[in-house]
């Protein structure tokens, strides 16, 4: 089975992530989804993906749900590792960031080498580069996580 390239300009997402996230957003936000910037960003990425692929075809350098993502601050070089999770598992103290939080929404669907502009609690935006994905479920054969 051939892996997809993650370099597509329109992006690539997992069909499983798309299905689960669209249902989650519809169920929890309904018409209010347009007023939440993080939710809007995730929906935009889901709807504008150039490729929606079966989990086993997802390239290992793509940020998918339940991935561990290594970020590097483009100015200071500071390293930050986060785990991209569903809202019910959001726990910043454990480095678990919901895909529907600005941190998670900023990295979802990006690839190693891409940049994400992430605001802190005070609204100051820092540019982070996706430096690596130490764990991605699809790359390890966990195709239903």
Model-based region annotation:
Residues 131-145:
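Short peripheral tails and domain-boundary helices/loops at the edges of structured domains
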Residues 40-90:
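Long amphipathic N-terminal alpha/beta scaffold segment
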Residues 1-60:
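N-terminal intrinsically disordered, low-complexity, charge/repeat-rich segments that act as generic
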Residues 31-38, 47-49, 80-84, 93-98, ...:
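Generic detector of short, locally flexible boundary/turn motifs and exposed helical patches
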Residues 26, 74, 135:
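Residue-level marker of positions within ordered structural domains that often coincide
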Residues 66-68, 76-125:
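Non-DNA-binding regulatory cores of transcription-related proteins
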